[in-house]
Amino acid sequence: MGMYTELVMSTRVKEVPEVVGVLQYMAGNEPRPAELPDHPLFKTSRWEILFQCSSYYFVPRISVLFEHDDIGHYWVLISRADLKNYDSEIEKFIDWIRPYLEATNDDMIGYSRYEETREPTIYYGVP
């Protein structure tokens, strides 16, 4: 069967149209973009449902908010989901999104937690 890994994100995303379009799609707000970025994340079979997966092993259920902050001129991404991370979708997502975040290496952007692990993996912005 396999174990679940939880992903929780809370971060600011730069105003990059290609990135915003993909995240809008992943959040269920917009249709799939015609062109996808050239990154290993988009070669995985389940990247599209990364924010939509949920099991009974983690609480709460899925939650995703992706909205524009008109004052700060950035997008806010807040999400919580969990999936069987067979193809390292979580790590590939973090690798893809990190350069587009309004975050430094001191800013926590989220965490992941494997079902049988006590301590989460904390993710920070780019140095």
Where is each model-derived feature located?
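Charged interaction segments
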Residues: 37-127
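Short, extreme N-terminal segment that most often corresponds to the first beta-strand
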Residues: 1-34
